[in-house]
């Protein structure tokens, strides 16, 4: 069963997909969105759902360190609700605290990636971490 993991931001959505057995997550791409214009990348997401035969979504929930809802929690939940309606697939939420920080650290310390290049992959890597954390919790 393939699962798509999403890191929903205000300008981009990082996308990751699980392997067919649901053990590992791989970063796929970053979908540009524009909340102000109501552009949320659902057409591209539909292509990915079809191509990978996805059966579930996992959306990162950006909670605060004290476990309260952060400013983006509502937006992430609204995105999750919309994809549930559009694709009629289950949507689960995964705490994403510090995934972007973890992704940034990995890119700097382990891969020595420049700031400009980090911006191009950070959301995809964060989505991968969100999905991998979910998969690890499930197995």
Curated annotation (Swiss-Prot):
GO MF entry, a single one: nuclease activity
Gene3D superfamilies in the record: YqgF/RNase H-like domain
Localisation: Cytoplasm
GO cellular-component term (any): cytosol
UniProt KW keywords: Cytoplasm, Hydrolase, Nuclease, Ribosome biogenesis
Statement: the UniProt record of this protein carries the keyword Nuclease: yes
Protein family: Belongs to the YqgF nuclease family.
PANTHER family from the UniProt entry: POLYNUCLEOTIDYL TRANSFERASE, RIBONUCLEASE H-LIKE SUPERFAMILY PROTEIN
Record protein name field: Putative pre-16S rRNA nuclease
Protein source organism: Streptococcus mutans serotype c (strain ATCC 700610 / UA159)
Record lineage: Bacteria, Bacillati, Bacillota, Bacilli, Lactobacillales
